[in-house]
Amino acid sequence: QVMLADSKKRAQEIRSRLYQLLGVAQQITFGEAAKIATWVGGQTGVRPALLLAVLTKESKLGVNVGLCNRPGDPENKSWRKVMKASRDHEPFLAITKSLGMNPDITPVSCPMYDKQGNKIGFGGALGPAQFIPSTWMGYTSKISAFTGKTPANPWDIRDAFIATALYLKNKGVASGGANAEWRAVLSFFAGSPDSTYRFYADNVLAIARGYEDDLKTLGL
């Protein structure tokens, strides 16, 4: 009886824990996020714990997430400056227009910088899954096919989970166990399985192992 009570208490603690995501209108509990991830995983074949881990990692990358293009930000933080113009300006305008959002005050990610202060690539990623606008546009119809909702919204938690799962599946995540997951996660971060960024994939898989235990406790 004591063990059963402890198990139920542990499950309730996990279920009610806040699942921290940046770039969403409201916080959700881990229990709610776990249900979404389990549903998406069942539809796509991508491990739910891995989905939870990727979105956790994306929203905890730190200072670059959603801290550009906010109301009151200086011009050098505007979407016109932080995005790659030829690739992402037009898709960003299309996404915000379809959702009735003002592109000039819709938060996007800032570029990353190395230890010497040199800019690495571009900013402009959207929502909790941190898709760049041009990549998101390639998944909108696929996401809507799952949800029955148009247009797909990168700031919607369910849409973000689905987009992440579809991207990982496209990168072969379900083809061969842990190594396939590692390579797919690396591609999610770097665009290709570049081992320079192995720290990212290593960290995501470590987070996923913890979430696997949590999901078992919840019976998911």
Residue spans for each PLM region:
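Catalytic glycan-binding domains that act on GlcNAc-containing polysaccharides
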Residues: Y19-L220
